């Protein structure tokens, strides 16, 4: 297992909604995403626990894209991954954010 950690400067808070959201499942080719509202001095932190070692550059690209579209403040995202593709990662991140902000995923 490999643990990756990223931190992004946030620009806006997540819309009103839940304190946390959990989407996905930990299974082959999938992942679980937990998003929590926590005081992080305006930052968004993302921690990934993955079975697929050596893909840090790909994770960085996917998360850079997500952070550019959603520059959230005071949000922690925890990802448990079992080999999900970048498209699945992006989908689950979007779903988790929708649930956190009160929309149906």
Curated annotation (Swiss-Prot):
O-(phosphoribosyl dephospho-coenzyme A)serine: modified positions: 28
Keyword Nucleus carried by entry: no
Protein name from the UniProt record: Malonate decarboxylase acyl carrier protein
Keyword annotations of the record: Cytoplasm, Phosphoprotein
Keyword Cytoplasm assigned: yes
One GO molecular-function entry: acyl carrier activity
Entry similarity comment: Belongs to the MdcC family.
GO CC terms: cytoplasm
Organism: Xanthomonas euvesicatoria pv. vesicatoria (strain 85-10)
Location(s), subcellular: Cytoplasm
PTM (free text): Covalently binds the prosthetic group of malonate decarboxylase.
Stored InterPro entries: Mal_deCO2ase/Cit_lyase_ACP, Malonate_deCO2ase_dsu
Matching Pfam families: ACP
Main function: Subunit of malonate decarboxylase, it is an acyl carrier protein to which acetyl and malonyl thioester residues are bound via a 2'-(5''-phosphoribosyl)-3'-dephospho-CoA prosthetic group and turn over during the catalytic mechanism.
Source domain of life: Bacteria
UniProt lineage: Bacteria, Pseudomonadati, Pseudomonadota, Gammaproteobacteria, Lysobacterales
